[in-house]
């Protein structure tokens, strides 16, 4: 459905909602925050709705609504959207950047944004390391719990609207809805716990 943003306009509280990197986001949210996001979409005739937990979605409940809006903006602004190109190398050149593509001519740009994606996209992190950036080891986050040997799976399909979940031998806990699945546990509370406890769980080898 595309969870566009969260209905929180207090920048301090918004930063606190990020398990990692919240302090670094403060200056960015001071320039463009939740209210700006809502206004941006409304100015393009995309209305958002707020659910009980504060998450905001397009009233259509379809992610395609957001995709269509963003694509329309690229067309309106005459942005050259290039797909299916593989970047082999990037280097800083003067005040700009030189990108070397696979089987294509080298191109020059004033600035670049590197969206590395998940931890499987190692090449993006290697580029950043080569440019002198320090990279914190990427680890899984926002995942469900696979519990193959637990009897709780017998309750598959059960939804508990108000549950409190905690990582064993840790102070990290969250509250909210959970869903019992055929593989273990899922739902907003579980996903949030996996985000806040990502590094603790990695140290425990997700056991």
Language model features with spans:
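Conserved N-terminal/central alpha/beta ligand/cofactor-binding core
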Residues: 1-80
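An anion/pyrophosphate-binding glycine-rich loop and adjacent beta-alpha core
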Residues: 7-11, 134-137, 147-207
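Glycine-rich phosphate-binding loop signature in dinucleotide/nucleotide-binding domains
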Residues: 77-82, 104-108
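Short loop/edge segments at beta-strand edges and connector loops
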Residues: 81-85, 137-139
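A conserved short coil-to-beta-strand element within the FAD-binding core of flavoproteins
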Residues: 83-97
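Short hydrophobic core segments
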Residues: 87-88, 99, 107-120, 127-129, ...
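Short, basic, low-complexity termini and linkers enriched in Ser/Thr/Gly/Pro
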Residues: 93-95, 101-108, 167-172, 203-205
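Glycine-rich loop(s) and the adjacent beta-strand/alpha-helix scaffold that form part
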Residues: 111-153
